[in-house]
UniProtKB/Swiss-Prot annotation:
InterPro entries reported for this sequence: NADH_UbQ_OxRdtase-like_20kDa (IPR006137), NADH_UQ_OxRdtase_20Kd_su (IPR006138)
Identification of the protein by name: NADH-quinone oxidoreductase subunit B
Cofactor details (free text): Binds 1 [4Fe-4S] cluster.
Protein's gene: nuoB
UniProt-annotated binding residues for [4Fe-4S] cluster: C61, C62, C126, C156
Keywords for this protein: 4Fe-4S, Cell inner membrane, Cell membrane, Iron, Iron-sulfur, Membrane, Metal-binding, NAD, Quinone, Translocase, Transport, Ubiquinone
Length: 182
């Protein structure tokens, strides 16, 4: 070990090369296979799936079903889902109900205020594609025209159980993502 330290002191490393004291030639099979970054990805995704903090953007009758999902019968707290009042504290936005043209800039503004990484759940037929009011002049035909949507929950209005299923699907999607570039 002392010889390695002497060699490092007398012969500096070439630019761009990292040398490990325990492996002087730089071969590290764990790093080559991506083991360390995979483990950090798994740790981050485990933490993100266990602590999803949605911000509600209830626009119509689907918001009532969202309140049912947060009540004691289904208890979203057991999945680590805690509703937050501020977009700066949340990482999931649940868009529930009819999105009209006047409300679209506000939706985008709230989405932009959320910290990264952020996910969007579109809840109900109106949020997914305009729903019953699809042909109205003032209705946005799907909130995916304003913000990128990760999970679509169908129904008019969807049941609280369907929203819980959508949240569980989002947790699976988060678990599969790779956050660290290799």
């Amino acid at each position: 070990m002392i010889q390695t330290l002497d060699r490092l002191m007398t012969n500096p490393m070439p630019e761009g090369r990292v040398e490990d004291i325990l492996r002087p030639e730089g071969e590290n099979p764990l790093l080559e296979k991506g083991y360390v970054t995979t483990s950090v990805d798994a740790l981050l995704n485990w933490a993100r799936t266990g602590s999803m903090w949605p911000m509600t953007f209830g626009l119509a009758c689907c918001a009532v079903e969202m309140m049912h999902a947060g009540a004691s019968r289904l208890d979203l707290d057991r999945y680590g889902v805690v509703f937050r009042p501020s977009p700066r504290q949340s990482d999931v936005m649940i868009v529930a109900g009819t999105l009209v043209n006047k409300m679209a800039p506000a939706l985008r503004k709230v989405y932009d205020q959320m910290p990264d990484p952020k996910w969007v759940i579109s809840m109900g037929s109106c949020a997914n594609g305009g729903g019953y009011y699809h042909y109205s002049y003032s209705v946005v035909r799907g909130c995916d025209r304003i913000v990128p949507v990760d999970i679509y929950v169908p129904g008019c209005p969807p049941t609280a159980e369907a929203l819980v299923y959508g949240i569980l699907q989002l947790q699976k999607k988060i678990w599969r993502t790779q956050t660290i570039a290799r």
